């Protein structure tokens, strides 16, 4: 719907986790469905994604599902407020997708730390498979597992959400080169490998890449 912005990697990472072929790791880090064909639908340019943006994307999928053979839609975005699916246009489009044979999967949201832990559209739609997050602390020890601040129901319509819990952190995924995220990752790798007496010089040589590191270094002087 829009020209891709190379600085935006939020939706691309789930795509790779779902269907990546692991080419950068010789197949070691592959997605759950590496043989899948992926249709990338760009909802907006850099900045905020609105309910209307998501609705437009789903309507495009409905119109083009047969042309591209689309059977599953994954959405890594959510709306702005809790709304009943009976009156919410975005939720209604989710139901239309389901009626057309398209499975809609959506992140349930990151508001589990809020008092009302709201589940918003499209995840709150009855036919949407909402996915919550698990933090396994990068360990196979079940005792170390915990939730990752995911939103949860009941929804405003009394529906229990999410339907599925999946790992949401400690997942290997590629980072788009030459982006702020990639620069921060490279800097953190340097710091991790450096001896203590080299930490401040490295931070001083890379001012502006990670504001939190800059602020921490300033406080120590």
How would you label these PLM feature ranges?
Residues 110-125:
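Glycine-rich, charge-decorated loop segments at or immediately adjacent to ligand/cofactor-binding or catalytic sites
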Residues 24, 44-48, 79-82, 110-114, ...:
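Solvent-exposed loop/turn segments at secondary-structure junctions
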Residues 42, 74-78, 105-108, 132-133, ...:
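A cross-family glycoside hydrolase active-site/sugar-binding cleft signature
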Residues 123-221:
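Extracellular S/T/G-rich loop segment that most often corresponds to the catalytic His/Ser-adjacent loop
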Residues 1-52, 66-71, 99, 124-128, ...:
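Subtilisin-like serine protease catalytic core
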Residues 58-85, 107, 210:
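Short acidic, glycine-rich surface-loop motifs adjacent to enzyme active sites
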Residues 26-28, 90-94, 115-119, 149-151:
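Short beta-alpha junctions and helix-cap segments that line functional grooves
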Residues 89-104:
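Catalytic-core regions built around general acid/base machinery
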């Amino acid at each position: 719907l829009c020209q891709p912005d190379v600085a935006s990697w939020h939706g691309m990472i789930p795509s790779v986790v779902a269907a990546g072929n692991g080419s950068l790791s010789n197949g070691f880090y592959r997605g759950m469905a590496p043989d899948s064909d992926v249709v990338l639908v760009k909802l907006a340019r850099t900045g905020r994604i609105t309910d209307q943006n998501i609705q437009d994307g789903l309507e495009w999928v409905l119109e083009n599902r047969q042309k591209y053979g689309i059977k599953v839609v994954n959405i890594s975005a959510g709306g702005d407020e809790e709304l009943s699916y009976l009156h919410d246009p975005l939720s209604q489009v989710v139901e239309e997708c389901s009626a057309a044979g398209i499975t809609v999967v959506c992140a349930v949201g990151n508001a589990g730390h809020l008092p009302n832990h709201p589940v918003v559209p499209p995840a709150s739609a009855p036919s949407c498979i909402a996915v919550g997050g698990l933090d396994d602390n990068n360990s196979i020890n079940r005792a170390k597992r915990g939730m990752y601040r995911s939103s949860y129901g009941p929804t405003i319509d009394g529906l229990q959400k999410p339907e599925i819990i999946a790992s949401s952190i400690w997942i290997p995924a590629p980072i788009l080169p030459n982006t702020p995220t990639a620069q921060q990752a490279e800097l953190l790798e340097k710091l991790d490998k450096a001896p203590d007496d080299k930490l401040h010089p490295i931070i001083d040589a890379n001012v502006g890449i990670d504001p939190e590191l800059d602020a921490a270094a300033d406080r120590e002087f």
